Amino acid sequence: MLYLEDYLEMIEQLPMDLRDRFTEMREMDLQVQNAMDQLEQRVGEFFMNAKKNKPEWREEQMASIKKDYFKALEDADEKVQLANQIYDLVDRHLRKLDQELAKFKMELEADNAGITEILERRSLELDTPSQPVNNHHVHSHSLGEKRKHNPSSHHSTTDHVSEKKFKSEALLSTLTSDASKENTAGCRNNLSSSSTNNVYNVNASQPLTSYNISSLSTGAGAGAITMAAAQAVQATAQMKEGRRTSSLKASYEAFKNNDFQLGISLSRDSATYSSSALASTLTQTLTSSATTDSRSGRKSKSNNKSASQQSSSSSSSSSLSSCSSSSALAHELSHQQTAAIPESDTNSQVDWTYDPNEPRYCICNQVSYGEMVGCDNQDCPIEWFHYGCVGLSEAPKGKWYCPQCTAAMKRRGSRHK
């Protein structure tokens, strides 16, 4: 499930393209404005000197002014066309994002029915601003007294920073615990007594920096959420150096920049399910420096699911049948299977309803879907092509021209000879 990495790679050049086009658009706008100012000045001089000159001079000046006005109008029309091209470019990437989201949602629903609704509802709850809970009793003082540097105020500031850091790190644990409450309430009483129970009592006076993600225990129903997070980090670590650095940085910034106010106590019983193997896998993946290509790391879901279900059924009681899907997903991460089986084309296709007004691309005259490649010829009438329609299986190196433009360039070359 590398839809995020693929989409980030696709829009990597988008900011530069937009910046170049906006710069060109701004230059054209300045050119039109300067032309209009000069024309207004010429019109004023024309009316001032019209009575003094002959009719032939007036006709000549009038024709020259009209010609310059039409040229300014053409420049303005070109600027509007450039703005429309920018709009189409952004709209094409937005539609691609919607398609990738639909594919990812269908994969999640195939593994755990109803999990996307829980994730979306939890995301809305976290996005809703809540009243911050003040766990540190800081006395109110005047503005001048607040600026004084004393040990007590310094200690409060340090505790607040540590608490903020702890809240961002505990986001994954809170997501999985709440999702397991809503989705797998009936599974908790059926787990065998051999599972590990961990109780966490967090106090504000304790050093919060000792919090370790490897000690987290999550509910059985939250296996899909934890699996998705671990797979994202794992796939990022398996990417090439350039993409891995940017993706990991984006993942860390997403956790650090979100200050979620967790006013509730984090002391809760685990759902009698041990995820130490999963947490250790996540920790090892964060520090790994594997440089294998991310596209070759996709596993076959059917083989992984069957193998993990067999191993989990041998070590669990028969009452785990209702929770076998989540436990199998968690067990899958702990074994790190190395066999990579490409997905079939039928699994990658999504039943997507297209807008009849959506632009058409490629030689097949269809809408944008899947992987597409752009022709480097600026005058290409089609511009974007599907990989399969032009016989490509991966991104071409260097400049690439479509079959029509290639044939046209060959014809022009033969004429010059």
UniProtKB/Swiss-Prot annotation:
UniProt-recorded Gene Ontology molecular function terms: zinc ion binding
Site (Histone H3K4me3 binding): Y361, M372, D376, W384
Biased composition range(s): Basic and acidic residues: 156-165
SUPFAM superfamilies to which the protein is assigned, alphabetical: FYVE/PHD zinc finger
Comp. bias (Polar residues): 177-187
Major location (coarse): nucleus
Biased composition range(s): Low complexity: 189-198, 284-294, 303-320
Region annotation (Disordered) ranges: 126-165, 177-198, 284-320
Keyword Transcription regulation attributed: yes
BP GO annotations: chromatin remodeling
Basic residues biased stretches: 136-152
Domain of life, per lineage: Eukaryota
Keywords assigned: Chromatin regulator, Growth regulation, Metal-binding, Nucleus, Transcription, Transcription regulation, Zinc, Zinc-finger
Cellular component annotations (GO), alphabetically ordered: Swr1 complex
Zinc finger (PHD-type): 359-408
Cross-referenced CDD domains: ING_ING3_Yng2p, PHD_ING3
Binding site for Zn(2+) 2: C375, C380, C402, C405
Localization in the cell: Nucleus
Protein residues bound to Zn(2+) 1: C362, C364, H386, C389
Pfam families recorded: ING (PF12998)
PANTHER family tied to this protein: INHIBITOR OF GROWTH PROTEIN, INHIBITOR OF GROWTH PROTEIN 3
Record family assignment: Belongs to the ING family.
UniProt free text on domains: The PHD-type zinc finger mediates the binding to H3K4me3.
Subunit structure: Interacts with H3K4me3 and to a lesser extent with H3K4me2. Component of the NuA4 histone acetyltransferase complex.
Function as written in the Swiss-Prot or TrEMBL entry: Component of the NuA4 histone acetyltransferase (HAT) complex which is involved in transcriptional activation of select genes principally by acetylation of nucleosomal histone H4 and H2A. This modification may both alter nucleosome - DNA interactions and promote interaction of the modified histones with other proteins which positively regulate transcription. NuA4 may also play a direct role in DNA repair when directly recruited to sites of DNA damage.
The name this protein goes by in its record: Inhibitor of growth protein 3
Encoding gene, per UniProt annotation: ing3
